[in-house]
Amino acid sequence: MAKEKHLTSLDFTASHSGSITRRNSMLTVLGSALALAGCGGGGGAVVAGAGGGAAGGATSALTVGQITGFGSIILNGNGVRIDDSSASISDDDGNDLRGRLRLGMCVAVVTASNGAGNSVAAQSIISSGELQGRIVGTPNTAQNTFVVMGQTVKVVGATVFDTSLPNGFASLATDTIVEVHGQLNANTNVLKASFIEKKTAPAFFKIQGFVSNHNASTRKFNIGPILINYANATELRLTPANGLLVRVRLTAVLPPLALPAEWLATRVRGPEHLAENRGAFEIEGGVTSFTSSALFSVNGVPVDASTAVFERGTAASIALGVRVEVKGSLVNGMLIATRVKLEDDNELDEREFELHGSVANLTATTFTLRGVTVEYGAATLYRRGTVTNLVNGAQVEVKGVATTGTGAATRILATRISFES
């Protein structure tokens, strides 16, 4: 049996009174406030420019993806350093996150760009996780997985654990409340984690996934095994429909034991509300809906790849769940792709991180850089200096990977240290 096509908010969807057209659905999306978030899409607050107005327009650039470096901020392992010193930095509710961004977090970054689309200083950065809730059952140490509200989460080599989980995977236990950043694979329905943080008494839970068993009369639907009631949702930015990728905020109260147990939704949004044209747009993620190799979506963002150049593969390789990096421009809510690069999941599972800054708290085996603990040793390579130049205050560039073992993901193992002037 062919796998069900997942929908984006630009596909035909059902309203309470019947069907609405693709055109009307697009107008609904474009009429919404610009809501952007990280690796797996997600709702958000209005993106504000550095001057306080709405950032955007055809001369601005937008990059959506994972934080892979600091000094200033680096996304998706591309090595481009974006100056965040004057940017507004917040979560998707507008709460200030300055000084609280972490490696592995999923973000949307708006920058200025010239006619060629070359980014300069960031105007705004919005971070948002894909899942927040209580761990159910015992985490599976053999498979490196755990379950939150029916959603299976996979921990990989590049998963970063916040210091609130000091023993990495071993810190996870039944009933621990966590926020997870990552990418949902539309083919396997597994959320591959890029960052995990422990939460204490959060005001709400949240989940992102594909709608199934939608009942417009009772205003209920499923995401995976959980039943969601949105009858009293105070913010409903789209009409739920089977196959649609949605982001739902839930009350942080466990459903009653009596079946069918229902989670109560307070907000339902699409993964991306793209209200402004962008001269340059870049997104890394999984294919979440597929019509053809020329028309698909990435993390809920519709992509027209009819004239794109494909790298590290061909157009025939595009399928549901495949990881890609897409570059182009955003026109009327559609990403007009100029380049589509197919990505290897295994490579990304061991992705390299990059840090720039001043060495602090130096010991014989570790130091701190940009708030991150870095391990170094005999296997570390050096450029423009040697280990004797590694002193507190030294300006360095570090490239490395998340370490393995207890507390591994809270540290970076340096594979190369370069001394900077």
Enumerate the language-model features and the residues they cover.
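N-terminal secretory signal peptides
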Residues: M1-G38
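Solvent-exposed hydroxyl-ligand-binding patches built from regularly spaced Ser/Thr
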Residues: G44-S421
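Short, conserved catalytic or interaction motifs in soluble domains
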Residues: G41
